[in-house]
């Protein structure tokens, strides 16, 4: 540790000696005024930095000289192009914003030129929905007079007649479609009304049938009474110990009830 500390101190001392030996490059302040903070913080480049820069420049010069010598030995020549741009540099044109509504976009009319671009060529405006054939030709001619040609002018009467015929055909077709739709809707409403009436009649009949049905609460046949149904099924296979018949238990035997009545009338004892 002592050696390391001593070596670092020696290096610092050598660095300070080199800095003091080097000539100051910072300008002196006039009239003995105190220099500003930026001037005081600026330090002159160290000798190591200058030596490194000089070595790099010398290495680059040697490299260029070697390349030129090798090219000369190979018979190659060095060409230097000096091109001067005589055209003045103009600033890049910014984005041109044009406000247009849906009508102008659909019509396909050219967008008017702006005041800044009067000298430049203006291309046709953007088109949205385009029409083809004989559809809406009159509107397109109003917006674009160039679309009309001599042949189209000669055939204008024939095209107008055909357009009117097409419009009449379209009107008749639309009327037929509307009539068919109305007829189908009326038929569907009648079918739904008849179905509702049939459902109402059926529900009334079922309600009357439920009201007229006799319900025995002792023999309920619901979903929650599965144990009772199983018991009734088992009883149907059992034989009575009193009369010997199947289908009832001893406590439900009609002969036993009849015997009990006879014994009560006679005042005898009851068999249990």
UniProtKB/Swiss-Prot annotation:
The keyword Metal-binding applies. Liamocins have high bioactivity against the pathogenic bacteria Streptococcus spp. and can be potential new specific inhibitors of oral streptococcal biofilms without affecting normal oral microflora. Liamocins are also able to inhibit human cancer cell lines such as breast cancer cell lines T47D and SK-BR3 or the cervical cancer cell line HeLa. InterPro entries: Znf_CCHC, Znf_CCHC_sf. Residues 175-215 have a biased composition (Basic and acidic residues). It comes from Aureobasidium melanogenum (Aureobasidium pullulans var. melanogenum). Induction: Expression is regulated by the cAMP-PKA and HOG1 signaling pathways via the transcriptional activator MSN2. Moreover, expression is also increased at low pH by the pH signaling transcription factor PACC. It is found in: Nucleus. This is Transcription factor GAL1. The keyword Zinc-finger applies. Its main location: nucleus. A zinc finger (CCHC-type) spans 240-255. Residues 113-122, 152-174 have a biased composition (Acidic residues). GO terms for molecular function: nucleic acid binding; zinc ion binding. Disruption phenotype: Completely abolishes the ability to produce any liamocins. Blocks the expression of the PKS1 gene and reduced expression of the EST1 gene. SMART domains: ZnF_C2HC (SM00343). Residues 1-10 have a biased composition (Polar residues). GO terms for cellular component: nucleus. Transcription factor; part of the gene cluster that mediates the biosynthesis of liamocins, glycolipids (also called heavy oils) composed of a single mannitol or arabitol headgroup linked to either three, four or even six 3,5-dihydroxydecanoic ester tail-groups. Positively regulates the expression of PKS1 and EST1 that mediate the biosynthesis of liamocins. Gene3D superfamilies: Zinc finger, CCHC-type. Pfam families: MPP6, zf-CCHC. Keywords: Metal-binding, Nucleus, Zinc, Zinc-finger. It comes from the Eukaryota. Residues 1-49, 102-215, 246-272 are annotated as: Disordered.
